[in-house]
Design a protein with these regions (language model features):
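Hydrophobic alpha-helical segments
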Residues: 65, 88, 144, 158-160
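Catalytic cores of nucleic-acid endonucleases
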Residues: 147-172
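Accessory nucleic acid-recognition modules appended to NTPase machines
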Residues: 1-139
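Short conserved micro-motifs at the rims of enzyme active sites and ligand-binding pockets
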Residues: 82-84, 144, 154-156
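Active-site ExK catalytic segment of metal-dependent nucleases
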Residues: 139-149
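A structural signal for isolated positions on well-ordered beta-strands in alpha/beta enzyme cores
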Residues: 120, 141, 167-170
Length: 172
């Protein structure tokens, strides 16, 4: 359907970025309601194209209530649907950052299904961690992706303080 196609384009454009369902509806024409959009996002996820990573919280209920962070399963889907030239991706730090973060996210998603991992993101106020990966109840890793330009404040110290058993990983 046209709405699913529009959702895919929107999600690929905003890969590695949080977007609430309300904002999605504002961006999509003939959006219907959030239930329909969430269902289409689930179908795109099952097709291995695009998913909405949930915000990490120890409580499952709060994870489900969070706004998703879009993530493509393959960065070629992101670049092909955007129409943005390679030189622009290389020249604009924000675009390059989203591309690099999407590449790391795509790899994590590929490993997640093979190894039974949970892939999330985390933010408290302005402090943020790009990815939180869990395996079972006893293994937690916080991953920060660096791509050249400093973005906001890293929340790594805050996350590790709240979750002292978590491992710290910096990519880039």
């Amino acid at each position: 359907p046209a709405l699913m196609r529009a959702l895919f384009r929107l999600g690929a454009t905003y890969s590695a970025q949080e977007l609430s369902y309300t904002k999605m509806l504002g961006q999509l024409q003939d959006a219907g309601n959030t239930v329909t959009v969430a269902h289409y996002l689930d179908l795109l996820d099952k097709a291995g194209m695009l998913c909405g990573i949930q915000k990490y919280d120890a409580k499952e209920v709060r994870r489900r209530k969070s706004s998703p962070r879009f993530m493509v399963y393959d960065t070629s889907l992101m670049t092909a649907s955007s129409g943005i030239e390679k030189s622009r991706y290389l020249g604009e730090p924000d675009l390059r950052g989203h591309l690099v973060e999407s590449a790391v996210g795509a790899r994590l998603l590929a490993r997640a299904s093979e190894e039974g991992l949970g892939v999330y993101w985390w933010r408290e106020g302005t402090k943020e961690v790009d990815f939180v990966v869990s395996k079972g109840f006893d293994s937690l890793s916080a991953i920060e992706v660096k791509s050249g330009k400093e973005k906001g404040q890293s929340g790594m110290a805050d996350f590790l303080s709240a979750h002292p058993s978590a491992k710290r990983i910096v990519v880039g």
